Amino acid sequence: MYKNEEYLKRTIMEQSRHLFMYGYATKERSEFLQSLEALYPMTNNHSKPVALYFDLFGLPRVETDIKNKDIYMLHTMSREYLSFLIASEILAKTIKSSENNLDDKLARLIKLTNIGRNQNHDKITYTTDLLEKFKISRDFYYENYINYVNGVIGNVSTDDIALPFLNLEMFVSQYKRCMDMKSYFGIVLDKKSQLSSFSVQAVNNFIGARINGDISIKVATEPDDWETYHCANGGLIEGVHDYGTIELDESYRAYAKKLRRPIQY
């Protein structure tokens, strides 16, 4: 167990500030972070924050040369994958919580989502249909990213999916309005594997956005394992919006001590 574990849990979830949580990538860290879902669940009481835990949240690092690839497309696929991943989990947990009259409550959200629907696809009517379409889009971007960077395909067409794009900020804002939710979603991202640099920047874009009243990104990583703190536009996160840091263990102090060592020639 971590020292002051209960204090850490409250500090993480009872403030809407975006956070970087520094700690060794251990089973203990994952179990601690996952326990936040049980403490801050999706319930019919919409006055408290909701924790959503992800240990797989980005597109994988593919060791291949991307200098001839469309960088804008890679950023787009990374952003949309993360957006559909988070939205899918929100809807899945909402359906599982057995809300009454869910289709009626989310009717406005479904209507707004239909505006961005590919017109060659059927209109979305039910929450379960919306979740299915979100999952299809999520998987589409994951698979096509890998195929594109590996040269299996030369272009990515979104004609075959009903929902090619999702504004996550709009989705969560409208979801809260429909459900009369007064708090926010704490998106707990447990970095346990190597990510595409584009996915790292997609996360940074959300942290750099002023959306933490609705979506608060909380990244758990080893101190030297987050590839960059730059957003997709090249600017640093803190140049747009500040974030907090939490030390789960002694890893950050050990990292800082290492940085202070003199260079050995």
What kind of feature is each model-predicted range?
Residues 153-221, 231-234:
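Conserved Walker B catalytic segment
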Residues 1-2, 17:
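Intrinsically disordered, low-complexity acidic/proline-rich regions
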Residues 24-26, 56-59, 190-200, 220-225, ...:
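An acidic- and aromatic-residue-enriched active-site/binding cleft used to recognize and process polar
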